[in-house]
Design a protein with these regions (language model features):
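Compact integral membrane and secretory-pathway proteins
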Residues: 1-211
Length: 211
């Protein structure tokens, strides 16, 4: 098994590490803001509540959706011949990413309220993809690569755009300069690697199989 074959899993892990890492750094660990925090935090910002700044709250969860669906799309693709342990690891990453869509202190009743419809739908979609991942492996290369590209593109665009929109307000709230943390850049790097592998990795492997 070539190291290159594991770059899909590595890309997913890098994306999650960046997403869970600091997006706005602070000397006090309790004031560090991660990508995962933002989906809840923006609800309480005065400028967002007043409508002065417009953000799509659920957009901050797109990296989780991209990682989860991406791992499910690739885990059983025949050209890579992943061992069962490797497939299990990729699907475990997919499940962990999906479950991180749950809000803090969630309950089944709370997840059925309009505020969390999209998150509930995202979890259901991601877990369904895990369940049918052997079938997803039969999709043509170009459809898989295009889907990965779309997912990762949205996972960069929505969170980064809206984070930069609210960054001045968060900095004012925390009374410091709003220094960007490493998490944002690592997440973007992981998603870019995923896209690159989606086209070059899948295409090269499947050409060899056809040959």
């Amino acid at each position: 098994m070539l190291f290159r074959n594991w770059l899909f899993l590595i890309a997913g892990l890098l994306t999650l590490a960046g997403y869970w890492g600091p997006w706005m750094d602070h000397r006090a660990a309790g004031l560090v803001i991660t990508g995962l925090d933002l989906g809840e935090l923006v609800k309480f910002l005065p400028t967002v509540r007043s409508g002065a700044v417009t953000v799509w709250r659920e957009g901050f969860y797109w990296p989780l959706v991209a990682v989860s669906l991406g791992q499910s799309l690739v885990a059983f693709r025949i050209p890579f011949r992943y061992p069962w342990l490797g497939r299990a690891a990729m699907l475990a990453v997919a499940v962990v990413a999906a479950l991180n869509l749950l809000p803090p202190a969630w309950t089944p009743a709370r997840m059925m309220t309009p505020e969390f419809y999209l998150q509930s739908g995202g979890i259901a979609l991601c877990l369904a993809a895990v369940a049918v991942s052997p079938v997803l492996a039969l999709l043509p290369h170009r459809i898989t690569a295009a889907t990965i590209t779309l997912l990762c593109g949205l996972a960069i665009w929505f969170p980064v755009r809206d984070f930069l929109r609210v960054l001045p307000d968060i900095a004012a709230l925390y009374n410091h300069s709003g220094r960007l943390g490493w998490g944002l850049f690592v997440m973007a790097g992981g998603l870019i690697l995923f896209v690159r592998m989606g086209w070059t990795g899948l295409d090269g492997k499947e050409r060899k199989v056809r040959g």
